[in-house]
């Protein structure tokens, strides 16, 4: 029998038997909200880079933080669902605006960095998400303590680098941060599943976790590509 004549059963590939139907429905809502966030964040980035109508700065950062706190403080219920979706969209929009300065920098160095960084982030995020979904339940939850410790060390090294000004430490922080965020995609995805299995159906807040992971991954990969491109240009001179 020719192996090329075999039919691929895509239904079997997308079947997560270890996840209950109610949690699968919850995940659909989470990723639908995530798609909404991506679209709105792209609009926010467009507003900063192209129209300049709203500029990234202290006000946009405080606005993003304020909307996230407001969203967190608003209880999840059917009555507050539309309000919280509006807060989520506002948070995503201002997050996109906040990416503006990094986008401007990359465009100045080489505009092709942006699609490369986005496609790379999308591939990384998708691969690690599928790994978490197909893996045995709770198999990646042990990463929580390790990831938080790594984040603490990264924050301390970043603060220390304000005084030392080491480019090597800055680059190391970017690469380590990229690896840590990949771990957070695994951890957060499985944590969302466990929360849903235990009755926490707040898909809007769960979306915030994944959206924040994606944006941080994108920012770090974008900066790594920008630095590499800048180094290449220096070598050519």
From Swiss-Prot:
Q: How does it sit in the membrane?
A: Multi-pass membrane protein
Provide the record's note on post-translational modification.
Ubiquitinated by BFAR, leading to proteasomal degradation.
Q: Transmembrane ranges? A: 30-50, 53-73, 87-107, 113-133, 140-160, 167-187
Q: Which GO terms describe its biological process?
A: apoptotic process; autophagy; cellular response to unfolded protein; negative regulation of apoptotic signaling pathway
Q: Which family does it belong to?
A: Belongs to the BI1 family.
Show which residues sit on the Cytoplasmic side of the membrane.
Answer: 1-29, 74-86, 134-139, 188-206, 228-237
- Which Pfam family would be a valid example here? Bax1-I
For the Lumenal compartment, the record's topological domain ranges are: 51-52, 108-112, 161-166
InterPro entries in UniProt: Bax_inhbtr1_CS, Bax_inhibitor_1-related
Where does the protein principally reside? endoplasmic reticulum
According to the UniProt entry, the cross-link of type Glycyl lysine isopeptide (Lys-Gly) (interchain with G-Cter in ubiquitin) is at 7
Q: Which organism is it from?
A: Sus scrofa
The free-text domain remark for this protein reads:
The intra-membrane loop at the C-terminus acts as a calcium pore, mediating calcium leak from the ER into the cytosol.
User: What is known about what this protein does?
Assistant: Endoplasmic reticulum (ER)-resident protein that confers cellular protection as an anti-apoptotic protein by limiting multiple stress-inducing pathways surrounding the endoplasmic reticulum and mitochondria. Inhibits the activities of the key sensor for the endoplasmic reticulum unfolded protein response IRE1alpha/ERN1 both directly and by blocking BAX/BAK binding. Modulates ER calcium homeostasis by acting as a calcium-leak channel. Negatively regulates autophagy and autophagosome formation, especially during periods of nutrient deprivation, and reduces cell survival during starvation.
Q: Which domain of life is it from?
A: Eukaryota
Subunit details for this protein? Interacts with BCL2 and BCL2L1. Interacts with ERN1.
State any GO CC term.
endoplasmic reticulum membrane
Q: What name does UniProt use for this protein?
A: Bax inhibitor 1
**A single GO molecular function, which one?**
endoribonuclease inhibitor activity
Q: Which residues form the signal peptide?
A: none
């Amino acid at each position: 029998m020719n192996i090329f004549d075999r039919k691929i059963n895509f239904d079997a590939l997308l079947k997560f038997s270890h996840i209950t139907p109610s949690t699968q429905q919850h995940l659909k809502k989470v990723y639908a909200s995530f798609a909404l966030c991506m679209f709105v964040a792209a609009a926010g980035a467009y507003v900063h880079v192209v129209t300049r109508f709203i500029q990234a700065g202290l006000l946009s950062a405080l606005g993003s933080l304020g909307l996230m706190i407001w969203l967190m403080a608003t209880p999840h219920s059917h009555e507050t669902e539309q309000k919280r979706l509006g807060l989520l969209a506002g948070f995503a929009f201002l997050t996109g605006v906040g990416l503006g300065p990094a986008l401007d920098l990359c465009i100045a160095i080489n505009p092709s960095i942006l699609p490369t960084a986005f496609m790379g982030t999308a591939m990384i995020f998708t691969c690690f998400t599928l790994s978490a979904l197909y893996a045995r339940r709770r198999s990646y939850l042990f990463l929580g303590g390790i990831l938080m410790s790594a984040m603490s060390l990264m924050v301390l090294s970043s603060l220390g680098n304000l005084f030392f000004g080491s480019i090597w430490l800055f680059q190391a922080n970017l690469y380590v941060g990229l690896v840590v965020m990949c771990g957070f995609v695994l951890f957060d995805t499985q944590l969302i599943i466990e929360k849903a299995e235990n009755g926490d159906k707040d898909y809007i807040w769960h979306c915030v976790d994944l959206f924040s992971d994606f944006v941080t991954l994108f920012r770090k990969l974008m900066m790594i590509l920008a630095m590499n491109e800048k180094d290449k240009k220096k070598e050519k001179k």
